[in-house]
Amino acid sequence: MKSNFSKFKDFIKYKKVAVVGIGVSNRPLIKFLVKLGAKVTAFDKKHREKLGSISFELEEIGVDLVLGENYLDKLDGYDVIFKTPSMRIDRPEFVKAKESGAYITSEMEEFIKYCPAKVFGITGSDGKTTTTTLVYEMLKREGYRTWVGGNIGTPLFANIEEMKEDHMVVLELSSFQLMTMDVSPEISLITNLSPNHLDVHKDFEEYVWAKKNIFKYQSSNNLLVLNKDDDLTNGMENEALGDVLKFSLVEKVYNGACLSNNKLTIQGKEVCDSKDINLKGRHNIANLLAAFCMVNKYVSIDSMKYVATNFSGVEHRCEFIREVNGVKYYNDSIASSPSRTLAGLNSFEKPVILIAGGYDKKIPFEPLAEGGYDKIKILILMGDTKNKIRSAFEKVISYKKCEMEIVIVNSMEEAVKVADDMAEKGDIITLSPACASFDMYPNFEIRGNEFKNIVNSL
């Protein structure tokens, strides 16, 4: 049973509240807390000069600022602390604050706890954003007032009082957001699981444990959707507290969705033929099947079919840019893990020229080399992980006794130039980094946009 938001309003009024992080996603939260009568202090590692006008904007509405390198040293004396998702709860500063009586939470935890609408939560290693968008589009097509947020869209907590019981909310949830959750969405999905974010999580086990929080606090009338083709997620059925639906690309599924004789079906009913889908790759068929399971109780087959056959994808996800001199360019900048890059490679019918490399999340690249060596014509590497990826591929090339040209570059511009020079008519060039962007770019969108700008200037 969800709590009435009036309880939160009564709780937060006059409280001393610390908000850690003044990033774009936290700014609406800070302003909303001020509106609710809290005495807010905002903390950030950046200095005033780097934050820009937002620092003055917040001070004008009565927010105190704690800025600079040692900003977390001053977390004492607060009733409530909203932490940024990527910051671990076991940091000494948070442990000390909690021992002193502070209530430590996050925007997403409070949102799910008090949101009056039905909440659909999507997590997993790959396919989260596309599946979140598909679920959103299907619900919207059916006529529901639908909100989308979490890792995509806009922060929703500040809009919670506009939401009603007959509305629908679709959330993309990361392992960081889920780590401290003690509340779960009513309808939850884990798309798949593979090693990721091991630069933040202690190990893969902790990463999986965090993902499980998406269903750990469900009730008996809630729904969990699992990937039958993924051993890890398939095995979670025994831990489910409510109903379970599964989806599969390779097996017949009667209690869920599957691909059967090139037809996408849900609960034995045909939705559409795979040849009529706009999205590229089998991984996107899996995303559609997962979405069907999530919305099955709320959406007609007609609405599912409309979205499946009309939705053409999300930016930076196997996104076709242009064809130049018979060479096709694709932007898959979202691919920040080896498994996501492998899924992208599998969506092409011939070996490609791959541009990869980036920030090191401490995850192995051997699975990408093992699964992708025969899908790559030329490998162009850049970023912090360039030598690590090269080493993984050189081992496989030696073992398999095959050939692949590997080129090391120092910038995106150089990567595109090398790819363009080496490409022949009919080739495919794709940016699918298998890594996060933080060594060279603030986020994957900026990385993808630079790639597109360079390609469009050829």
From Swiss-Prot:
Please give the catalytic activity noted in the UniProt record.
Answer: UDP-N-acetyl-alpha-D-muramoyl-L-alanine + D-glutamate + ATP = UDP-N-acetyl-alpha-D-muramoyl-L-alanyl-D-glutamate + ADP + phosphate + H(+)
**A GO CC term?**
cytoplasm
Which EC numbers characterise this protein's activity in its record? 6.3.2.9
Q: Which GO terms describe its biological process?
A: cell division; cell wall organization; peptidoglycan biosynthetic process; regulation of cell shape
Q: Where is this protein localized, as stated in its record?
A: Cytoplasm
- Pfam families to which the protein is assigned, alphabetical: Mur_ligase_C (PF02875), Mur_ligase_M (PF08245), MurD-like_N (PF21799)
Pathway per the UniProt entry: Cell wall biogenesis; peptidoglycan biosynthesis
Record carries keyword Translocase: no
Cystine pairings recorded for this chain: none
User: One MF term in GO for this entry?
Assistant: ATP binding
Q: What class of enzyme is it?
A: ligase
The lineage's top-level taxon is Bacteria
Provide the primary localization. Answer: cytoplasm
Q: Which UniProt keywords apply?
A: ATP-binding, Cell cycle, Cell division, Cell shape, Cell wall biogenesis/degradation, Cytoplasm, Ligase, Nucleotide-binding, Peptidoglycan synthesis
Residues noted as binding ATP in the record, renumbered to the chain: 124-130
Role this protein plays: Cell wall formation. Catalyzes the addition of glutamate to the nucleotide precursor UDP-N-acetylmuramoyl-L-alanine (UMA).
Q: Describe the family membership recorded for this protein in Swiss-Prot or TrEMBL.
A: Belongs to the MurCDEF family.
Q: Known HAMAP family for this protein?
A: MurD (MF_00639)
Protein name in UniProt: UDP-N-acetylmuramoylalanine--D-glutamate ligase
Gene from which the chain derives: murD
